Structures are given as C-alpha cells and as structure tokens.
Amino acid sequence: MIFRTLLFLLAYMVTNSVAVMDKQTYIIHMDKTKIKASVHSQDKTKPWFKSVIDFISETSSSSSEEEIAPQLLYVYETSMFGFAAQLSNKQLEYLNQIDGFLSAIPDELLTLHTTYSPHFLGLQNGKGLWSASNLASDVIIGVLDTGIWPEHISFQDTGLSKVPSRWKGACEAGTNFSSSCCNKKLVGARVFLRGYEKSAGRINETMDYRSARDAQGHGTHTASTAAGNMVSNASFFGLARGSASGMRYNSRIAAYKVCWRLGCANSDILAAIDQAVADGVDVLSLSLGGIAKPYYNDSIAIASFGATQKGVFVSCSAGNSGPSSSTAGNVAPWIMTVAASYTDRSFPTQVKLGNGKVFKGSSLYKGKKTSQLPLVYRNSSRGQRTAQYCTKGSLDPKLVKGKIVACERGINSRTEKGEEVKMAGGAGMILLNSENQGEELFADPHVLPATSLGSSASKTIRSYIFHSAKAPTASISFLGTTYGDTAPVMAAFSSRGPSSVGPDVIKPDVTAPGVNILAAWPPTTSPSMLKSDKRSVLFNIVSGTSMSCPHVSGIAALIKSVHKDWSPAAIKSALMTTASTSNNKGAPISDNGSINSAFADPFAFGSGHVNPERASDPGLVYDITTKDYLNYLCSLKYTSSQIAILSKGNFKCAKKSALHAGGLNYPSFAVLFGTSARNASVTYKRVVTNVGNPSSSYAVKVEKPKGVSVTVEPRNINFRKIGDKLSYKVTFVSYGRTAVAGSSSFGSLTWVSGKYAVRSPIAVTWQ
C-alpha cells in the first residue's frame, strides 16, 4: 500500500514538474481596439487583461491535461499594449484564439553595453547650452540600467528647486533602499525583476540588492554621465583629476533598475519603459541591448516607438561587437543609436624590452614602475592550453613567480587575467592584442602592474620572447594622465552598420565619447569588479557604448531645454546634421577597427561625432511623424498584424503615402543597388524645416560616392520665416561598373547658408 502511494506521489510530482517546465514567459502584444471591444462585450467591470487571463485559465482547466494557471507578470498600456505572462504551450494556443491577439514573443535576457568629456565636447560653464537660463528648465532623464547609488555626491540635490508637479514617479523601497533615498535630484527609483527571476531564478541578495540600489556600478556610472552633478577634484586614484560632470548636470534623474547579474529581461525592460513614459520622463537612456531583430520582434524598438509617440527622446547604445560589419543593435529609425569613440585624454604606459625596444601602452594601474624582470609567455602553463590567455588556474606559480607574464586577450576578462597572474605570484602583466584586435588600447583598473598593447607591439614582443638569444625581460612604467592625443578616434569595439534589419537607414546615427570615461561609482563595488579587489572608489573609469549613450542622452536634454517644442525626431536631426567628421587636428576621423587605422565611415560613426553647441542651432531639421514611421514599416512589407504591434491597433498602409524604404525623411541617405546594376537609379524626397534665420537661402553641396552620380533638385532653397517647410529630391544613379556584393562607397549632401552647414552622410551599398 505504501509502495502504491509512493508511486502515485512520484507520478503526480513528475506530471506537475513537466507542467511547470512547459511554462515560459512571453511578451504578448494585443490590438488595443479589438481586445477592449471583445472583452467589454463580456464583462465591462473586469479589466481587459483579467478577462484574457481568466479565459486562458478556464479554457485550459477544462481540458483533460493538468495545467497550472497562467501567471501575469506585467501589463503594458502606455508605450505598447499587451502584457507579460508565464504560459504553457497549450495556453498559448488558447490565447491565439482571442480576437485582438497579435503576437507572443518569448522573453529573453539582454546584456549591458558596457568628467573630462564635457570639455572635449565644447561645453563651457556659464556659456551656450550651459548658460544659467538654459539650465533653469526642468528636464527629467530616465535611465534603465543596474540601479543607482543614491547617496553619491553626484546625485545630491543642493540648490535644486522642488520636483516638477508634472512628475508622477515613485521611489520604491527595497533592500537597503528606503523611499527617503530619493530627493530633488534623484526624483524616482523603481525595480523591475519579475521577468528576470522567472528566467534566472530568485536574485542572490549576497551579490545584488533586491532594490534600486546599484551593486554593479554600471547604472551609477551611466546616470552620472548623463546628468550627474558637477563635482570638483574628482579622479581615479589621482588619474583624470578634474571636475566630473554630467552632460546636463542639473537635470533630474529617474532610475529604473532592469539589469541584474546575468542580464536584463525584455519583459522587465518593456515594463520600465512603459512606466517611465507614464511617470513623465523627457529622455530615456538605455545602455543595453541584444542582436538586431525585425522591429515587430524587438522589444526595445516596440516600446521606444510608443515612447516616441508620447514625445520622449530615446537614446540607446549601439553595442560592443565591433569592428565586424552589421553588428549594431538598437537600430530602429526612431531610436538614436550611439557609437563610441576616444577623447584626447589617455593613460599611457611604457614597456621596455631587454633588447632596448620601447612600446606605448595604456593602463589605470596607479603604482610604481617595475624593474627589468623576466618575461614569460605560454611556458608558464600547468599543461593547460589556455595558459596563453591566463585563465583561472592555468598558470604555474613555480614558472610565474616574480616575472612579467604576457597574456593574450580572450576567454576571460582583461582584469581577471591580471588577477590570475597576481594569484600565481606574477609581478606584472602585458596584455597582447591579436591582429584582428588591432591597435585598440584599454586602460583597465588592474590589481597589479599591467598594461595593454596594440597588435604591432604585441607581434614584436611574441617574436622577441621566442627568438631572443638571451632570456627575455621587460619593465612597465606608468606615465599618469596626458592630453592632446589625436581625437576623436573610433573605438574598434564599437558595433557597426549597415543595419541587418533596415539597411535603408544608416546606423549607428552618431558617435560620442565612450572610452576611458570617468564617472560616479558605488563605494562598495571594486573598480575592477573582482572579488579579490578590496579597493573603494567614488569615481571609476570605464569604456563601452554604454558610456557614449548617456552622453547623447544628456545632450538631448540640453537641446530639449532650448527647444521645448521640438519633436524627438527634430532633436535627433539636429544632433546628426551638425556632427563633425573631422578630428582635433583637422583631418578625417580615423578608425581603430580598420586596417592601419584608416578613416572612419558612416557605418562606424553614422553622421559623425556629436557637437552639442552646433546642435542647439542647426539651421534646418528633418522632422518625422509617427505616421511616417508606420508608413516606413509598410515599405518593408510588414503585415498589418506586425505593424499593429507597434501602432497598438489597426493601421492601413495607403498606397499613395507608402514610402520607399529609403524615402523616410531621415537626416541621412542609405542607397541600395544590385551588384550588376548599370544606370540603375533611385530618387528620394526629403523635407527640411527652417529653425535658423527667418529669411535664409541655402545652396546644396554634394560629395559624390565613388561609382554613383548624385543630382539634387532644386539646388537652392529659400525660406521666408521660421517653421517654413521645403522639399527637395535626390536622384542616385549607379553607373558603368559591376560592383562586389557587400561593397559600399560614401559621400555627403550638405545644405549651406552662412554659418549653417546641414550635412547628411550618403552610404551606397551594392547587394
């Protein structure tokens, strides 16, 4: 009897566990008009989402199979329309029967795209965009990230006026975070973790806070980059000493914690954007993302479209998967996609070999130089093939102790390599670049004397180690902080275009400082993020498109202060058409991701490097309505159901207004031709709005891409007043050659009038 009972219990447990395992979190998109009409006809007292969940529960429970009731995680009603829930396969089938159902997207985890820059960008205290009159305006920047360290000096509210009455946000209490943590600077803090915990399990509170408090540093860093207070005498152990400041340093900040140790759940990101728009943010900053997807299947694209409809400017990082082509994420045309580049500040080191050769490197190590020490590589192994990468447990202390170890990049993080060398008794580390990794130098907060080197120096060092007649030696010296390097230079890691889902729009849009950025950091989080690192800092130096994105978010807030009636598209246009393609020496911007650091192109930096002061007075703007964006989706041959996911309901693609994909009123031109196209042509129309001098005349200047003729009609446009809109057409003709598939050529189209030069890049690609 007991045996039968055990068998019964075991069978029940197995059946129940299978039912649980069958569950998955889905983001459900609904047609707002249809679903409300459908459920209200049944019970007008019940919320629409409750009616949907009840229908699924009742239908599934009436079947012969055991089903656990669906679990509702979020309801989305502002930036998109739908909900997130845990459903079984059967329940998903029942949901598909409901009139108004559009799509179900499985939830997934996305990743983070992991001072002096205001000066480098030309912002000056008391002048221009940083004038008292401009900074007096209230702008609220919402930051979706790993949370925030509210007590940091960068987020104190001294001198700020009371919180705007329009603000509807909240300060949610949680672990080590009370509602009193917010103030007139940090006006809101919310947590979104339901999707993450369904995917990765309950948050480990020994490693993270189950609240808006930041345990990783990333969110604190990005928030202060966008809008942190101006803090004098900030530095990283004396490096980069100066005033640390956000781009719009007296903006309010609202922190939305959506990212945890293992990533950021799409369902949580959607909920945060939905809530942020309802709360009343003016700008959204997202330094996170995944691979590019069709817009109807991209949660950030969908929610950002809804935010744009409400007048919210959305800035996103392009990603850190460069320099390979078509790696950029967050590429929807209504999103400002930001690449990363260097400023002219560096943290140089000097590596001297035993043969007298000297190489320049980079590091944030703040200690004494090493003496000339034995240099080892590969032969430091315990028999493990990964010893050249200095992975955990791969180094033999007997072979490493007291020596400098050369380590290849890859497999583990750069600071983890240094930690492994130190734990094995090594006295220093030289981080080697492969040929593919180029001349990119990383300044990292190493726990021992260490430096990174470019590929050419790395190649020489490998040869020296293998072929030196004497035992190889090296020393590392640390030279502090220097200024005046050629800049900007595109970072090799910055993700590139062309867009894999919308090649008719150039992506990324612009580049901004994203390498070696000094910004706020939680004092309980080590600068290297290593457990063995017991150092505490208030400011850390970090690199990534995660760092460039909040620069643009803060600059957009500055522009919004000057032009309160401008749409997100107009602000975006101003930032793009005034961006610079030249460095501080007057030469074209170079690219660390290309062979021999050749000149960067629009697939690396979009329209160029942001220029805040010029963007505040662009002369002309290319404006785009949400209807224009929807017609653009029509031109991509999206179905009505796919478009409805973004429009939140029925939208009919009218033939007469349907755009050619490249005909969106975008501030750049992406042109596609077949490889064997000869004399093939395409004509795009653009409309520009005068926001400069009331009475003004512009003449066009064209730099033609190789292999293409460009004709503009008319070649002169004349405005009578501010707000006037005039159109022009551009015809591109591919002539007389058979191109290689995937090859591109570049040019530009600029409208010139006095001090104004409204520039649009041209990218022609042969498919």
Which residues are covered by each model-predicted region?
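Loop-rich non-cytosolic ectodomains and luminal regions
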Residues: 2-767
